[in-house]
Amino acid sequence: MNLLELVEKAGVTGCGGAGFPTHIKWNAKADWFIVNAVECEPLLQTDQYLMRNRADDIVYACRQAAEMIGAQNAVIAVKRAYGKEIAALEKAVETAGAAVRIHRMDSFYPAGDEQVIVYEVTGKTVPCGGIPLDVGVVVSNVATLAAAFDAMKEEPFIMKYITVAGAVNSPAVIRAPLGTSVSECVEAAGGAAADDCFVVSGGPMMGKKIACDAVSGRVTKTTSGILVLPKGGFMEEYKGDMDLEALKKRARSACIQCSYCTMLCPRHLLGHPLEPHRIMRAAAFSEDLDQLLESDGPVRNASLCSLCGVCTAYACPMGLEPSKLNAFLKEEMARRGIRRSGKETTVPLPDREWRKVPTGRISRRVGTADYGGTKEDALIEIRPEEVAIALRQGPGVLPQPVVAAGDRVSPGTLIASIPAGALGSNLHASIEGTVVEVSDVIRIRG
């Protein structure tokens, strides 16, 4: 089998974002193949662990993927502050004699946004509403490359490297089977260090608040971090829900139109016509949602928002939440099938370099700077007695279960499959045991 067939069979997906199936993303021709090893979110250290401990695998997979898509340029983008990680990668490149370049980036947020990386590495800007492939670039997360290397050895994607951090007693990088409960992951890191906490899956800026006792409280293919955070602080409000009327009332009463949200918006700095202050103004004085969305102007440009949260967590002096409004509008536009017109090219703003937000400053602003880091090369392996693997692991079609209650499975047994070439990913058993439930999850008990 070729590389595409191997990653499809193994069920490899993107590990750093929405979980887009890798066999679909890599089925392309491009001039550039970029490995996103920036890991720009505060607290997350998973990719750093992988670079230190699996550099040879990452470089090998990078070279193979670049050759497959015909890329003349294979690049690993990493923060220049990651000295040990860069040294490990450079040694792996030298040992392999690989034509892979290490690109050093400054520590700013969100340096790991794929459109930011494309510009920083290639000098090209992705068109509004476009994807990196529009400018001849394919970007994949470093953890995806590690999973692709495993797939080359015909090992399915059934284990996740995850940072467990925040208000825990022993922050750690863990390796957990898909479907492991979040509560078990937290216990592996010494348990919560405070009584009244909530959990975020992902990074503090773009991660999602989850319930530990629900299906959402399980390790999936896209789980990069599990953060335990105390209630009562900024992060609880930042991750809380708010309806449109509440957002409109706050915008009407408190927005001073200072435009800081727009001036610091990473997508606006790349030249995109995304202007959060104009969206806030429109929302404040619109009669209803229909009126707000009727014109193809500033409001529909909310679809360009990456939801990085710079506007809400850092820029706004009034404590307003433009990113939540953008998220609401994006979801509503998708539900109604509304798309902004145009896919225009962009030119970065001349003062972009001076408006980048340092990662350390945003970490202090949101209250995560004082939490301890993980032990550098320690890895905790979790072996749960039961897993519940959700059929929905990312975009596309749901895989169809090929097992039934009562079936015995081993790690790597195919339990749900997608049609050949479909947008979606195969699922495999992550532990040995008996299938006890097949619904929107496949539950396996050891």
Q: What name fits each language-model region?
A:
Residues G11-N27, A313, L423:
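Conserved phosphate/anionic-ligand binding catalytic regions in large, soluble enzymes, centered on
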Residues G16, L43-L44, G123, D290-L292, ...:
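Flanking helices and flexible, charged tails adjoining ferredoxin-like Fe-S electron-transfer domains
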Residues V35-D47, V168:
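Gly-rich Lys/Arg/Thr-decorated short loops/hinges at beta-loop-alpha junctions or inter-strand turns
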Residues R52-I69:
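Histidine-anchored nucleotide/phosphate-binding helix
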Residues V75, R80-E184, A188-D195, V200-P204, ...:
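Hydrophobic alpha-helical positions that pack around
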Residues A176, T220, V403-V409:
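Short, well-ordered loop/turn sites that connect or cap secondary structure elements
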Residues D195-P204, A214, T222-L229, E287, ...:
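Beta-strand/loop-dominated core regions that host nucleotide or nucleotide-derived cofactor-binding catalytic loops
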Residues L229-R252, T262, R267-P348:
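Ferredoxin-type iron-sulfur electron-transfer modules in oxidoreductases and energy-metabolism complexes
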